[in-house]
Structures are given as C-alpha cells and as structure tokens.
C-alpha cells in the first residue's frame, strides 16, 4: 500500500510522493536547550516512527533534527542562573540518554552554532543591495514581500497582527517583519557578520540548516502544532523570498502537543513542566492520531499503560529460542502505519501477533507465529535494537559498567542531598529491569 500523510499545508490527507523516487528528506524542529527535557519533548517519537516507515519504503532516507543552541531564552536563562555557555550542553546531555529508551535517533542532528556561516549567507540573499543599512545592526525580513504568508495557519498578515497591542520595534519598517540578525552585547554570544557582531534570529536557523543538509526544497518538514505560527510561517516566507519562490517543503506534518491539566500546552516557557526522567511511556504513539493536543493525566495513564502492556506481551512472546523472522512486516501492521501513522491500530495488531504466539499449540504453529512477531521487531529496530527496552529486555541492553555508572551517579546525588535526582535514577533503572538494594556496605543491584 502507498503511504498517506495529513499535510497541514493543504489541510487534507494526501498520497506521499517524494521528489526523488528512491530518496526522502525530512527535517524536524528539535528542542531549544535552555532547560531539562520534559515529557512533551518526547512527542517527536512520532517522527521516529515515520522515519522507520520511510526507511522500509524507500532506499535512502535522511532525517535531520536540529538542536537550537543560540537563542534569547538560552541567554536569558544564563543571565538568571549565572550559568556559563556550557549550560546548554548540560540540558542537551540528557536528551540522547532519555531518547535512548525511545530509540528515536535522527540521521543528522545539527547544532545552530555550527551553521552560523550558512545563516549569514542566507540572510545575504534576503538583504537586497537597495535595502537601507539595517538599523542598530538588526536585519529584518519584510514578510509582505511574499504574498502567500499565512498558508499554513490560514491567517492573513493583517489577521496575525490585528489586536496585538504591541509597540512596533523601532528597527522594524512593518509590524509583520521578523528578525534575521540581531546585535549582541559584550556579555552575549555573537559572531561577526556584514551587519556587525551579533547572532541569528530564531527562524533563520531552521531555514539555513535544512537547506545545508537537504537542499532548497525537500519532502517533509515536521514539528509541533505550536510552531505553525509564527515559526514555520516565517521559515516559508524567508526561504521562498531567498530562492525565487521555490517551496521549502512539500509536506508539512505536525505532531500533537502535551497539555497539562487540560489547560495549556506543556512547555518550558510556560513553566508547567513534568520532566520526563522515565515517563517515556506517556509519550508512546499508541494513544491516538499524532495531530492535536494530548492531555497529560498524572494518575493512571491508561492509554500509555495499555500500550506498554501490549508490547510487554509482545516481548514476552519472543523470549526463548529465537525464531527466524519473516521477510515482510505483517500486512495489517504495515497497512495501519501507512494510513497516516495509525499507531493505535498498529498496536492492536501487535497484540494480535503476540496472542497468536501464546495461543499456538504445536511447535510449527508457534514458530510461524513467532516469525511474524520477529518480522515486526526487526523492521522497527533495523539496527538490531529493541523498539523500546522493557523489563528484562531493557536490562539486557545495559552493560554492567553502565549500571554501575548510574549507581555512582545516584550515590553522588544522594551525597549532594539531591534526593529528587537520586530517586529519578533509581526509577529509571527500575523501569529497565534493574533492582537496587541499599545496605550498610553500599548499593547492590540485580536484574529482574
């Protein structure tokens, strides 16, 4: 079956057809690393699911997910906390580890600070020779140069700025303009440019990095629903202005947001975070369509727990002597995923596969059923990793040295009276099937 995706650009589900038949490029907006990762940051696992599906369907797939390491929020956090410029690395550090259990790794993960020259070059295409010298070293992009601004959000420029009640900055010629390059003070990070020492505006980062790694136009651009306006609108505007109207991406896919207490989206800027730690299962894409705002329920988490229980049964069914995998992914699972990533339906089919193993009576029947399960496992984890380490399977993925290092980290946290961090590490190991026992001689561990 062909792949169908909901395209925010057209507001309908469309047949996916890549620009090049055997090659797909996908860019997804990653985190801004000014605070610890929270459970909402795990939602992009939806794009990992799409990445795996695309790799099954096409010979070559490039998945780019950026890291924003130079941003006003990062600068403000440093000023507030007194942290140095390495602080973003501390917040970025947990991301690979915490995404590790989710097994959600992109092909390329560029950092904004490593692409300043590309941003300067792109801004140079937007600043026309006849444009007056930028005021106070600030370059702005005139949105009205591109008439289709608003095509993602379905809002006109006048609607976007109507009622804003915000005074227009003196360096802007129009209230709809957005910053491409801004000056930096002595205490702020900055780079040399034709417009003086400064740093890039937020939106130019993704346009420049996507162009560098995927080209002027690529297949899929992903991100959260909250990025449609103004982030993705501005990316489209500046990219099309810079490249004679060429589109930035052909398909725009937006994942749902995590909403806390049924009120607002969960985000660092709103200060309503629940840090992920080991809450990976609240984000498993088995609880509904990737579009929309998903409420976080602190008690029960029935959808996530049901998904986890299903895959627990799946792994349990595969324990013992390994059975050879079938060549193809079971049709029902594949068909569900090809229908706009219908992960709830795919999960239900995985449950059926595991049930078939448990219900099989003869050795031949059981081997055939296990083979169908193995095909799903190997498709989902082509690098010979499990989809998500669970229980004993997760423990097996950790070496003794890894476990001992986490125990030492926990001991250091306890000595520093950082009991929340110590408890988090203990819970993290417990979720991976590692049981810790504290005694007079120190901490010992065993695999559950």
Curated annotation (Swiss-Prot):
Catalytic activity, reaction form: tRNA(Cys) + L-cysteine + ATP = L-cysteinyl-tRNA(Cys) + AMP + diphosphate
Co-factor remark: Binds 1 zinc ion per subunit.
Short sequence motif named 'HIGH' region, residue ranges: 31-41
Basic and acidic residues: bias regions: 79-91
Signal peptide location: none
Sorted UniProt keywords: Aminoacyl-tRNA synthetase, ATP-binding, Cytoplasm, Ligase, Metal-binding, Nucleotide-binding, Protein biosynthesis, Zinc
Annotated compartments: Cytoplasm
Residue sites binding Zn(2+) per the record: 29, 206, 235
Location of the motif 'KMSKS' region: 265-269
Family matches, as Pfam families: CysS_C, DALR_2, tRNA-synt_1e
Subunit-structure text: Monomer.
Entry's family note: Belongs to the class-I aminoacyl-tRNA synthetase family.
UniProt protein name: Cysteine--tRNA ligase
Species per Swiss-Prot/TrEMBL record: Azospirillum brasilense
Gene behind the chain: cysS
